[in-house]
Amino acid sequence: MYKTLCGTQLLLAIFVLFLNFSHATAKGTRGPMEIFKKNFMEKNKLNDVYDIFKFLYNKFSHDTYLSNIKNQSFTMNTWGFGEIEVVKTKCRKIDSDFYKCSFQWEFCNIKRTPGVTIYYITLPGSVRCRKLLSKLVNCPFEEQTEQLKREICYFQLYPDYIEQNIRSVRFNCYTK
């Protein structure tokens, strides 16, 4: 009986040590888990920014509809200050000879507000569908699409921005 009791106590002591070791390991991994969670949230924020951009582009552009642009097809930078170069054209996006349009160059200096981020999104030359085709997927008829050169858009969400209220936003695109 003495051997059984010692064996049981030994097993119990090993079990308690194992529990303590597991708890210490859990404490040690908690920091990296929080960092991972933070990175995950940032990735979700980028997706949210992309969705907002797509919505704003479709709402404020006059003749075209942005469709089927995947996350990999644009780059985004966040800048807090500096001058923004805005390019205007006399041609409408619907014009067939878009590449030969003459551009007017303007410089726009936007006053920065603390806590306001401006998102710059560069779209490579890609196909846009006309808005009347917005319910159709993939712009099915080639003659109803247009190929644009690289386009740079920026938008600014103000601190009082609420998800469903897109009134406090500044949005602009230009083509290079």
From Swiss-Prot:
Assigned GO CC terms: cytoplasm; extracellular space; vesicle
Disulfide bonds: C129-C139, C153-C173
Annotated glycan sites: N71
Name of the protein described by the UniProt record: Cystatin-related protein 2
Propeptide, residue positions: 27-30
Record keywords: Disulfide bond, Glycoprotein, Protease inhibitor, Signal, Thiol protease inhibitor
Phylogenetic classification of the source organism: Eukaryota, Metazoa, Chordata, Craniata, Vertebrata
InterPro entries: Cystatin_dom, Cystatin_sf
UniProt entry tagged with the keyword Lipid biosynthesis: no
Biological source species: Rattus norvegicus
Tissues where the protein occurs: Prostate.
Endpoints of the signal sequence: 1-26
Induction statement: By androgens.
Similarity comment: Belongs to the cystatin family.
Keyword Glycoprotein appears in the UniProt entry: yes
Gene name tied to this protein: Crp2
A GO molecular-function descriptor: cysteine-type endopeptidase inhibitor activity
